[in-house]
Amino acid sequence: MLIANDALELFLLIQDNSVEDSLRKALTAFSKADLKLYQKKKTEALQDFKQILIDYKDDPIADETLLKIGKIQQDLKQYNEAISSFNEIIEKHAEGVFVDEALYFSAEIYRRFLDNPEKAKALYEKVIFNHQDSIYFTESQRQYRLLRGDTNI
């Protein structure tokens, strides 16, 4: 199942980012950075993804690049930087498909690592009210209720 999901994700990445980038320069750079990430070279991958944002800032791949950057920063325990990357998705790509993930991952950082349950609750709430179709909807509800103090979960 995981392989099928990976293949579908790759197909959508190529399809979504081939229209405006007919030479696929941004997509090629993204795939090279993603390969470094797969090879566990997180610091190198992070630098490459950041360079993509500089070189292809107006490219449709920018939101997915920001998501990768945020996840790497979280893995490297750069929590404030990760939140900043996720916020950029929320603010600059508000109509994109990664907003729910950015909200959820930010909430998780606030809850698990920065000990700020109020900010986490506010972000979980945004997922609950604005992204009912998100795969993070149910978990956001659960975490929100736990932070609110519900005992009948």
Task: Please provide the spans of the model-predicted regions.
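Acidic, polar-rich low-complexity tracts and alpha-helical solenoid repeat scaffolds
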Residues: 1-153
